């Protein structure tokens, strides 16, 4: 649990980890988060709502820094979310065994298991949306203030963390709008109005984040769409190929399961009136998901974690299936047979998830080997005058925060494969950087070393500390 971020997409994992550590070390105000990467000057930057990074930072201040603390926070939120999802299944099925099996199925898609406690905000956003799902259902059964407030709390935190987690709320509300009683539209709208709060808060936060980043000339967390219709044919083919070859097999253990959903759904439409409560949210969720995928199409080539919040469709799809079985077969034997038939799928999900997690944790071997060394050089850096207050230029590291977070030093890296040009080095000097830390093949030629470095201060294994020219 105390491992540093590793494996697939450790760049993005280190962003959140860096923010939490900076909250702790610099005692930052909640609305002024900061990263190890200095960017233009200060390193002040923000993307998703940083509440949990802030709380983790406060925990560090009390208990001391440990990556294990971060993971336990993530695990606690995941456990709460999936416990409430189990409660939602129980509300719908009145069966403990069915609820447990369905809950395990939702919890064990291989991609979700791998990223579960691995620092990414997407997994906890999904879990929080499941909490919102439960309290929304409770509110529908009994419109109490407690259910409303708790539902709004969970959905607000989910959508503030990842906007795509809000698709589930829109899908749920859509049923009320489609099925309102004649002459009672206004009453329905008034009852649903509070559920717009998560989106209002998120809009306010997005505006603040844009303003905050602009103050420090930072565009790292800029959320831009890359729609399908703006790409060339070659780019579209590249996304499809990359997705199918890399991510598709890890959506669920049985990739063919997704292919069965369309005819399965079409079959259920024969009983639309009886299944309206399950059908409408499912259709709306699927429709919005298609729009989301088209808007961010290019991102799906390399960023599989964009899929995580879209797993909000799984509970809706599973309850749709249960409802079809109940309509077709009135006795409990059919449900029992369904449970028995589902066991191999759930078991395969669990098994595949374990293999995926182990495989992915050992990918990006270059980073894993390099960064484990960087996490062990704190005393060496202090001995050579590079304390936590002294910024450093870290090469070769094309990520914003990986090497800097592992060393726990602020500064610059050659982000996005930034060439070590005179202009870039001068920028480093302008923001107070006097040391160049070289690891692996950071300086590829003696010419670069002659131009940008003087005086090898010290070396430790394959890590070398220079003064900047």
Model-derived features: where do they sit?
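Membrane-interface transmembrane helices that cradle and orient dolichyl/undecaprenyl
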Residues: 90-93, 97, 132-148, 158, ...
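Short acidic/glycine- and proline-prone juxtamembrane loop motifs at membrane-interface regions
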Residues: 114-125
């Amino acid at each position: 649990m105390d491992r540093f971020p590793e494996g697939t997409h450790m760049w993005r994992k280190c962003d959140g980890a860096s923010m939490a550590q900076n909250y702790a070390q610099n005692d930052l105000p909640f609305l002024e988060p900061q990263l190890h990467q200095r960017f233009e000057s200060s390193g002040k930057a923000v993307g998703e709502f940083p509440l949990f990074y802030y709380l983790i930072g406060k925990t560090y201040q009390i208990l001391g820094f440990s990556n294990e603390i971060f993971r336990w926070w993530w695990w606690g939120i995941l456990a709460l979310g999936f416990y409430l999802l189990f409660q939602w299944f129980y509300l719908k099925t009145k069966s403990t065994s069915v609820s447990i099996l369905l809950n395990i199925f939702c919890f064990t898609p291989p991609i979700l298991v791998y990223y579960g406690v691995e620092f990414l905000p997407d997994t906890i956003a999904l879990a929080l949306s499941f909490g919102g799902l439960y309290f929304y259902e409770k509110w529908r059964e009994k419109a109490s203030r407690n259910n409303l407030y708790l539902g709004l709390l969970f959905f607000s935190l989910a959508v503030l963390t990842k906007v795509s987690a809000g698709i589930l709320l829109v899908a749920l509300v859509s049923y009320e709008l489609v099925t309102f009683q004649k002459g009672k539209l206004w009453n329905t709208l008034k009852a649903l109005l509070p559920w717009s709060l998560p989106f209002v808060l998120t809009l306010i936060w997005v505006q603040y984040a844009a303003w905050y980043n602009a103050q420090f000339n930072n565009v790292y967390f800029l959320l831009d769409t890359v729609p399908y219709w703006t790409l060339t044919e070659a780019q579209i083919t590249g996304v499809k190929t990359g997705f199918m070859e890399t991510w598709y097999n890890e959506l669920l253990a049985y990739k063919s399961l997704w292919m069965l959903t369309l005819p399965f759904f079409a079959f259920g439409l024969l009983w639309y009136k009886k299944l309206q409560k399950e059908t409408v949210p499912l259709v709306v969720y699927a429709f919005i998901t298609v729009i989301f995928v088209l808007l961010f199409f290019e991102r799906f080539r390399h960023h599989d974690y964009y899929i995580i919040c879209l797993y909000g469709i799984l509970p809706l799809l599973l309850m749709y299936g249960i409802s079809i079985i109940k309509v077709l077969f009135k006795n409990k034997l059919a449900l029992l047979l369904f449970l028995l038939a589902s066991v191999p799928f759930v078991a395969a999900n669990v098994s595949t998830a374990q293999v995926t997690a182990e495989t992915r944790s050992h990918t990006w071997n270059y980073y894993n080997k390099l960064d484990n060394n960087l996490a062990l050089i704190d005393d060496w850096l202090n001995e050579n005058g590079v304390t936590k207050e002294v910024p450093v230029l870290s090469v070769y590291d094309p990520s914003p925060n990986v090497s800097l977070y592992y060393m726990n030093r602020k500064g610059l890296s050659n982000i996005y494969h930034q060439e070590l040009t005179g202009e870039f080095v001068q920028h480093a000097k302008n923001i107070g950087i006097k040391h160049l830390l070289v690891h692996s093949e950071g300086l590829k030629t003696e010419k670069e070393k002659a131009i940008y470095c003087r005086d090898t201060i010290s070396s430790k294994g394959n890590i070398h500390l220079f003064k900047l020219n």
